[in-house]
UniProtKB/Swiss-Prot annotation:
A GO molecular-function annotation: proton-transporting ATP synthase activity, rotational mechanism
Superkingdom of origin: Bacteria
Organism: Thermotoga neapolitana (strain ATCC 49049 / DSM 4359 / NBRC 107923 / NS-E)
One Pfam entry name: ATP-synt_D
One record GO biological process: proton motive force-driven plasma membrane ATP synthesis
UniProt record similarity statement: Belongs to the V-ATPase D subunit family.
Gene: atpD
HAMAP family: ATP_synth_D_arch (MF_00271)
Protein name: V-type ATP synthase subunit D
Stated role: Produces ATP from ADP in the presence of a proton gradient across the membrane.
This protein's UniProt keywords: ATP synthesis, Hydrogen ion transport, Ion transport, Transport
């Protein structure tokens, strides 16, 4: 052992051990919360992806019908006049100290941004469903980003937990035991020396 077997070092190491155990408990709780959050996010992403797939299928069916009814060029002309959708905003929140994105979507506007009398129901439906799909794509992207960030943090936390559990805490315990054993041995030797000294004085 490289640590001198003194009572001062013993006290310091016991304090380090207490802090290491506290750190281990905190990190383990953090990892548990993150893993619980991940399970919920993965389940949410799965449901959204299923909804997104069915929404795209519905949108493309409506678009195909509009293309047949109005012609591809007319549909493209209407599409080029649709304003950019800017009703989404990304903000950040914290999950156990990990910064994760959240999406804010303003009230979904159902108003058609072109003259309805010049189109047909299929094109109107395609527009509305593609708007819904855009919102779902944004939600899925945000959730996937959250999953990536939290999974990365969970991996880092697991490494720290393993280091504390398998290396740092056992090493501290071993060093403490070594110092305690050494101090006890020195104490026994000192008692034996004093006993011998008393015996010599008594003769």
């Amino acid at each position: 052992m490289s640590v001198a077997p003194t009572r001062g070092n013993l006290i310091a190491l016991k304090q380090q051990l207490r802090l290491a155990i506290q750190g281990y408990d905190l990190l383990e709780r953090k990892r548990t919360v993150i893993m619980r959050e991940l399970v919920g996010l993965i389940e949410e992403a799965k449901k959204l992806q299923e909804e997104l797939l069915s929404t795209f299928e519905e949108a493309y069916r409506s678009l195909q019908k509009a293309n047949l009814d109005l012609g591809i060029e007319s549909v493209e002309e209407y599409a080029s006049g649709i304003p950019e959708f800017k009703a989404m905003k990304i903000i950040f929140s914290s999950v156990m100290g990990v910064e994760v994105p959240e999406i804010q979507i303003e009230r979904f506007e159902t108003e058609i941004p072109y003259e309805i009398y010049s189109t047909n129901a299929a094109l109107d439906q395609a527009y509305l469903v593609f708007r819904k799909a855009l919102e779902l794509v944004a939600r899925v992207a945000v959730i996937e980003n959250k999953v990536y960030r939290l999974a990365h943090e969970a991996k880092k936390t697991k490494k720290r937990v393993n280091a504390l559990e398998n290396l740092i805490i056992p090493h501290l315990k071993e060093t403490i035991k070594y110092i305690q054993d050494t101090l006890e041995e020195l104490e026994r030797e000192e008692l034996f020396r004093l006993k011998r000294l008393k015996e010599k004085v008594a003769r």
